Amino acid sequence: MIALIQRVSDARVTVAGENIGQIGPGLLVLLGVEKEDDEAKCKRLAQRVLAYRIFADGDDKMNLNVQQAGGKILVISQFTLAAQTNKGNRPGFSKGAEPIEAKRLYKLFNKNCSEMGIKVETGEFAADMQVSSTNDGPVTFWLQI
């Protein structure tokens, strides 16, 4: 399971011109689900994303996690994170989870985060979405479980 996380000043997602999720300061989480992923990996990744200290403290050091910084998260399903890109000119997607399982684990990831006390906004699974964000820093990390 893969999370590409970006520290943002703001982020939003629209589907068919309608705003369906929006946050101020916090994390934009692009979530990719792979075939071997399961509930345990999902929970561990949620814990790791929320605990990852990439927000500045009073000394301007990355010592605060998103909750300590008072932020929210916007989670977007992103199957292309599981792409195989090591050869050729076209990505392969055979490592990605089947859509039904990917959707289940995407929803579980969001539920796990909510249960850990963070405000979660989401995109729409498998929809054609437009995601806008202001990357703060820029600060972007790839987390994989």
Swiss-Prot record:
Its EC number is 3.1.1.96. One of its GO terms (molecular function) is Ser(Gly)-tRNA(Ala) hydrolase activity. It comes from the Bacteria. It is found in: Cytoplasm. Gene3D superfamilies: D-tyrosyl-tRNA(Tyr) deacylase. It catalyses: glycyl-tRNA(Ala) + H2O = tRNA(Ala) + glycine + H(+); a D-aminoacyl-tRNA + H2O = a tRNA + a D-alpha-amino acid + H(+). Pfam families: Tyr_Deacylase. Transmembrane segments: none annotated. One of its GO terms (biological process) is D-amino acid catabolic process. A motif (Gly-cisPro motif, important for rejection of L-amino acids) lies at residues 137-138. GO terms for cellular component: cytoplasm. Keywords: Cytoplasm, Hydrolase, RNA-binding, tRNA-binding. An aminoacyl-tRNA editing enzyme that deacylates mischarged D-aminoacyl-tRNAs. Also deacylates mischarged glycyl-tRNA(Ala), protecting cells against glycine mischarging by AlaRS. Acts via tRNA-based rather than protein-based catalysis; rejects L-amino acids rather than detecting D-amino acids in the active site. By recycling D-aminoacyl-tRNA to D-amino acids and free tRNA molecules, this enzyme counteracts the toxicity associated with the formation of D-aminoacyl-tRNA entities in vivo and helps enforce protein L-homochirality. A Gly-cisPro motif from one monomer fits into the active site of the other monomer to allow specific chiral rejection of L-amino acids. HAMAP family: Deacylase_Dtd. PANTHER family: D-AMINOACYL-TRNA DEACYLASE 1, D-TYROSYL-TRNA TYR DEACYLASE. Homodimer. Belongs to the DTD family. This is D-aminoacyl-tRNA deacylase.
